[in-house]
Design a protein with these regions (language model features):
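C-terminal and inter-domain tail/linker signature
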Residues: 1-147
Length: 147
């Protein structure tokens, strides 16, 4: 039984790595269907986005429109059972509007913790904690402490 869990866990980890590489880094938007369940529950979806796969596609479009050179690096990945946790490094240049912020032309880097719960080979539940404050400071929207 532990072999089955290990294989499933390893498959889920590989799926998260492939998701960031294919969908975001290679801009293969159609590949999102392979990774996200149509009814995925996203606990940290951006305001105004739909749920499920449609919402994930909206979020993808929002990020790639605002940051056309967006790149994710999976720095660490841990899995147990049906959950995968990835520690991410994110970088990009804001060339489009982002959550009501006009383009700044500034390059920014951020970190994020991404958690997915898998069933049937797809993410059915998602959480994302990103350093949004640091991102907004780098874009010049919020002053950094001491400025």
């Amino acid at each position: 039984m532990s072999t089955v869990v290990t294989m499933s866990t390893e498959t889920n980890k590989a799926s998260v790595r492939r998701f960031y590489e294919e969908v975001f880094n290679k801009r293969n938007r159609a590949a999102i269907d392979e990774f996200i369940d149509p009814n995925q529950v996203d606990h940290d979806a951006p305001p105004g986005t739909l749920g499920g796969l449609k919402g994930a596609k909206q979020t993808l479009t929002m990020y790639l429109t605002a940051f056309p050179d967006l790149h994710f690096t999976v720095e660490d990945i841990i899995a147990e059972g049906d959950r995968v946790v990835a520690r991410l490094a994110v970088r990009g240049t804001q060339q489009g509007a982002f959550m009501g912020i006009p383009p700044t032309g500034k390059q920014a880097t951020s970190t994020a913790i991404d958690i997915n719960r898998f069933a049937g080979g797809k993410s059915v539940e998602h959480w994302l904690n990103m350093d949004t404050l640091g991102l907004l400071q780098q874009l010049g929207v919020i002053p950094a402490p001491g400025q």
